Curated annotation (Swiss-Prot):
Protein name: 5-formaminoimidazole-4-carboxamide-1-(beta)-D-ribofuranosyl 5'-monophosphate synthetase
Transmembrane segments: none
Keywords assigned: ATP-binding, Ligase, Magnesium, Manganese, Metal-binding, Nucleotide-binding, Purine biosynthesis
Top class in the EC scheme: ligase
Role noted for this protein: Catalyzes the ATP- and formate-dependent formylation of 5-aminoimidazole-4-carboxamide-1-beta-d-ribofuranosyl 5'-monophosphate (AICAR) to 5-formaminoimidazole-4-carboxamide-1-beta-d-ribofuranosyl 5'-monophosphate (FAICAR) in the absence of folates.
Lineage of source species: Archaea, Methanobacteriati, Methanobacteriota, Methanomada group, Methanopyri
Cofactor(s) this protein requires: Mg(2+); Mn(2+)
Pfam name, any one: DUF1297
Gene: purP
GO molecular function: ATP binding; ligase activity, forming carbon-nitrogen bonds; magnesium ion binding
InterPro entries, per database record: ATP-grasp (IPR011761), ATP_grasp_subdomain_1 (IPR013815), IMP_biosynth_PurP (IPR023656), IMP_biosynth_PurP_C (IPR009720), IMP_biosynth_PurP_N (IPR010672), PreATP-grasp_dom_sf (IPR016185)
């Protein structure tokens, strides 16, 4: 595991007046890069061959580093170029998925915005639940074995899959039937099934709440929220019930887009309290706790109580909706999560706090 001291030693050799914000060319890269430029920082993207077009045509990247595969971001040549550019790398879901947690923790010797140690806590269900339970927020009941299923549950699998392979069932027999079908179709394998996370299906409305823990301002901000647009479930529910039954299609929950939403103003108090609790718990678990963006994926029940069913320990894909209403209220202008990150980096540099926002 790379120590924070090793990363800070690298940071100490940077020309702080010539900083870059860098990221992998996927997920939320467009907003991260645009935000860097808006705050007067150089923007750098590491991109796979054949995937540079959006960054070129939209003009958001000052430099494009082309690699054969995303995993090549770990190559020493690429890392050296990032250090030459005085780059601070912003992690996102694709970065975690392609570069890998072991690579990020042990091999990636470039300063990263945020707490790299917390990325594992979002990827492993048992760790994620431990953090949420420590925070004291409401979470769905978890079932240790398919044999214990006695109510509607949703079955999830490890890693950043964007909902692929998830399914709902109500008893052990239905679990076995649906799991076997997914294995036959090549969606999951036996190893995935052994690591299946089975949790109570909470009926409620979906709010994915986008937070920002600011070291510079010493506060936790709620910037905006979205809900997921999932295929094929969102298409199925548009069909009459009789047609759904006749079609015999198995619902899937693969995220294909995001829809901006706002919550009733009276519920914001709960959301701020949840964010504060999660940040305090993260400080106890992996110092210095959350830095910058994180997301709580929640369900709001008919009793107007929030259950947290998933955590993102970095910028979440839902921030691609651009307009974050509470960020607008705070800053008086449209501030994307990408720009909020760059603003924190710039202000931390200007106030001598940069060591506090990287690991």
């Amino acid at each position: 595991m790379l120590s924070r001291e090793e990363i800070l030693e690298i940071l100490s050799e940077y020309d702080l007046e010539d900083l870059s914000i860098a990221t992998l060319g996927s997920h939320t890269a467009l907003h991260i890069l645009k935000g860097a430029k808006e705050e007067g920082l150089r923007s750098v993207v590491v991109c796979e061959e054949g995937r540079t077009t959006p960054y070129e045509r939209l003009g958001v990247a000052d430099e494009i580093i082309v690699v054969e595969r995303f995993q090549d971001m770990l190559d020493e040549e690429v890392q050296e170029r990032l250090r030459e550019l005085n780059a601070i790398v912003v992690p996102h879901g694709s970065f975690v998925a392609y570069v890998g947690l072991d690579g990020i923790e042990n091999e990636f010797c470039v300063p990263m915005f945020g707490n790299r140690r917390l990325l594992r806590w979002e990827s492993e269900r048992s760790l994620e639940r431990k953090l949420l339970k420590r925070a004291g927020v409401k979470v769905p009941k978890v079932f240790d074995s398919p044999e214990d299923i006695d109510r509607p549950v949703i079955v999830k699998f490890p890693g950043a899959r964007g909902g692929r392979g998830y399914f709902i069932c109500s008893d052990p027999e239905e679990f076995e039937e649906k799991a076997e079908r997914l294995i036959e179709d090549g969606v999951i394998d036996e190893e995935d099934l052994e690591q299946a996370h089975i949790e109570e299906y909470v009926v409620g409305t979906n709010f994915c709440v986008h937070y920002f823990r600011s070291v510079v301002e010493d506060t936790v901000e709620v910037l905006g929220m979205d809900r997921r647009y999932e295929t094929n479930i969102d298409g199925l529910v548009r069909m009459p019930a009789g047609d759904q039954l006749e079609a015999g299609l198995e619902p899937s929950y693969v995220i294909s887009g995001n829809i901006p939403v706002v919550v009733r103003e009276s519920l914001l108090v709960q959301l701020y309290e949840m964010g504060d609790r999660v940040v305090r718990a993260s400080e106890d678990i992996e110092e210095p706790g959350f830095i910058g963006p994180f997301c709580l994926q929640t369900l709001c029940t008919e009793d107007l109580e929030f259950y947290v069913f998933e955590l993102s320990a970095r910028i979440d894909g839902g921030t691609n909706v651009t307009f974050l209403p509470y960020a607008y209220l705070k800053f008086g202008e449209i501030v994307t999560m990408g720009r909020r990150i760059a603003k924190e980096v710039r202000e931390a540099r200007d106030k001598g706090l940069l060591e506090g926002v990287v690991t």
